[in-house]
Amino acid sequence: MASVFSSLRRSLKGLLVLIPVLIGLAVTSPAQAAQWDAETLTVPADPSGTEVTFSDREIDSGRKVFNTSCGTCHAGGITKTNHNVGLDPETLALATPARDNVEALVDYMKDPTSYDGEYSIADLHPSMRDAELYPAMRDLDDEDLRLMAGYILVSPKVQGSAWGGGKIYF
């Protein structure tokens, strides 16, 4: 009987040592732990190739705005309503006009067009053009759009092919 209690006591001591470690892991999120280098945070600003470097804080703010305003349909960089068109770098670059820079993404969020750029889809896709139709866009300003664009462009550098890769990564 004494050996059972001795064994139980050793097990409990082991758990007591492990609990602070587990709490520390639970409290520290990857976003808090991430300190990305300038190369990771640097993305194309416009079609001419000019670059802009975002701060960690700006990317975190962009992530929050994106998740609140766009995350329902674009979680993880996918497009739930059209799995052929995601937010991965290749798809953004092949759009017409290309949407692989901050300026183009902001322009798209203001007045979205079809993937081939032939017609407006503002009546179907949330945008600033009709914030009454899409209330999630109502309170966003140009700075919010810029931060979301930064987040969209930095995400594949951090998450790799999982960003825009679809359900196989979830």
Curated annotation (Swiss-Prot):
What cofactor is needed?
heme c
Q: Which InterPro entries match?
A: Cyt_c-like_dom, Cyt_c-like_dom_sf, Cytochrom_C550, PsbV_cyt_c550, PsbV_cyt_c550-like
Signal peptide span per the entry? 1-33
Q: What is this protein called?
A: Photosystem II extrinsic protein V
The cellular component terms of Gene Ontology attached to this UniProt record, alphabetical and capped at eight, are: photosystem II; plasma membrane-derived thylakoid membrane
Subcellular localization(s) per the UniProt record: Cellular thylakoid membrane
Q: What is its main location?
A: membrane
Subunit organization: PSII is composed of 1 copy each of membrane proteins PsbA, PsbB, PsbC, PsbD, PsbE, PsbF, PsbH, PsbI, PsbJ, PsbK, PsbL, PsbM, PsbT, PsbX, PsbY, PsbZ, Psb30/Ycf12, peripheral proteins PsbO, CyanoQ (PsbQ), PsbU, PsbV and a large number of cofactors. It forms dimeric complexes.
The protein's matches in PROSITE patterns, at most eight in alphabetical order, are given as:
CYTC (PS51007)
Q: What membrane topology does the annotation report for this chain?
A: Peripheral membrane protein
- Spell out the family assignment given in the record's similarity comment: Belongs to the cytochrome c family. PsbV subfamily.
The record's cofactor note says: Binds 1 heme c group covalently per subunit.
- Report the superkingdom from the record: Bacteria
Keyword field contains Electron transport: yes
| GO biological processes | photosynthesis, light reaction; respiratory electron transport chain
The record's keywords, sorted A to Z, are: Electron transport, Heme, Iron, Membrane, Metal-binding, Photosynthesis, Photosystem II, Signal, Thylakoid, Transport
Which gene produces this protein?
A: psbV
**General function of this protein:** One of the extrinsic, lumenal subunits of photosystem II (PSII). PSII is a light-driven water plastoquinone oxidoreductase, using light energy to abstract electrons from H(2)O, generating a proton gradient subsequently used for ATP formation. The extrinsic proteins stabilize the structure of photosystem II oxygen-evolving complex (OEC), the ion environment of oxygen evolution and protect the OEC against heat-induced inactivation. Low-potential cytochrome c that plays a role in the OEC of PSII.
Gene3D superfamilies assigned to the protein according to its UniProt record, in alphabetical order: Cytochrome c-like domain (1.10.760.10)
A Pfam family reported for this protein in Swiss-Prot or TrEMBL: Cytochrom_C550
GO MF annotations for this entry?
Answer: electron transfer activity; heme binding; iron ion binding
Residues bound to heme c: C70, C73, H74, H125
Q: Look up and give the organism this protein is from.
A: Synechococcus sp. (strain CC9605)
